[in-house]
Amino acid sequence: MSGTLLAFDFGTKSIGVAVGQRITGTARPLPAIKAQDGTPDWNLIERLLKEWQPDEIIVGLPLNMDGTEQPLTARARKFANRIHGRFGIEVKLHDERLSTVEARSGLFEQGGYRALNKGKVDSASAVIILESYFEQGY
């Protein structure tokens, strides 16, 4: 086991991506993947998996603030199931509440409004999701 994990922040137009190391508990953003109504470029995901060879994949689970599911929750679950089904890698879902808010705030502090492009926000959210997963001791 390499201790490498990939995280995805699922969205219908853009899917944020991050790579992290279990040993350091840190993650960094990778370029976001464009999606067509929630359908990603599966060839690109396959290339990412071959390049990084993760032990496990984390997919952000979008929930309402009260913990209830929202319309995007089922689509994120479906995305996670498809990754597992296509590639046979263990996939876990992780609560992503407030990750986008935190990502926007951090990017704005670094570069103002110009830093807030969709792909950067989505991949920064994936970093937050993965680091949160590490912080919870997984």
UniProtKB/Swiss-Prot annotation:
It comes from the Bacteria. Pfam families: RuvX. Keywords: Cytoplasm, Hydrolase, Nuclease, Ribosome biogenesis. SUPFAM superfamilies: Ribonuclease H-like. InterPro entries: RNaseH-like_sf, YqgF, YqgF/RNaseH-like_dom, YqgF/RNaseH-like_dom_sf. GO terms for cellular component: cytosol. It is found in: Cytoplasm. This is Putative pre-16S rRNA nuclease. It comes from Escherichia coli O7:K1 (strain IAI39 / ExPEC).
